[in-house]
Amino acid sequence: MKLLTLNTHSLSDANEDNKLKAIAHVISSRDIDVIALQEVNQTMNAKSISCDEHYVGRDIIKEDNFALALSKLLEGKYYWTYIPVKVGYDRFDEGLAIFSKHKISASENTLLTTTNDYSFWKKRNALGVEIKKGPQSFYVYTAHLGWWDDDEEPFIKQWKKLNSVAASKDMPVYLAGDFNAPDVLKDQSYETIKNDGWKDTRDLAKIVSGRFTAQGKIDGWDEAVDGMRIDYIWCNRDENVLSHEVIFDGKNEPVVSDHYGILMEDNL
């Protein structure tokens, strides 16, 4: 099974069409099974539209939705779902999306923050889906968590909620996304996740390519100019991970966001 995660930072750049085409090309050419996306945006005042049967979500989709545009480029070969999480940059519904080549049999939208104020930029949710691939069912969550030392909405409270729902699943589970959790900081977010029993798929991989997933200044990390590893794919068991590679970094496929992506393959 091939799983890609990417914080798309969508609708924020002038070259959205090229970005979409690059992402769709990689998904198709590499035959990726599941794609977990964060910062998937649509303009709040854009026109609402109806989607075809491959959209399995319940939330309203606007005509410029980034995931909708990606679905069209993928020519209906993937099921997909989307949730809006909060207002982004005063004009977007900022949300999460998951694409799957295989049937999505269930989904859940989990509020991670104390606040449920849609207009508050620190609001966080996780989108989870159950996917059936042949005889095997597994769960994938996509999430974009906050910062360890945030006074209002600290990482630890968000993580406890995500861990509570994800750890309850009696099947393989993958947590994919932007965790704002540099792996070099001791006794903080990264080590908290590991201490709760989750496996960093990079540690399990037989072949590893790349490290940093964000380079230079990005939102929330104004002083992080040397590069950070803050995007991850975690699993709840010692999977046979074949490879873990940083992608869309300008070396391994073109840069399409202020984050790089991660592509993981295991034998599920």
Task: Walk through the language-model features, giving the residues of each.
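Active-site regions of metal-assisted phosphoester/phosphodiester hydrolases
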Residues: M1-V34, K77-L268
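Metal-dependent catalytic neighborhoods of phosphoester/phosphodiester hydrolases
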Residues: N15-D17, V40-L73, G88-D93, V184-I193
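A short beta-strand submotif of the Rossmann-like class I SAM-dependent methyltransferase core
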Residues: L37
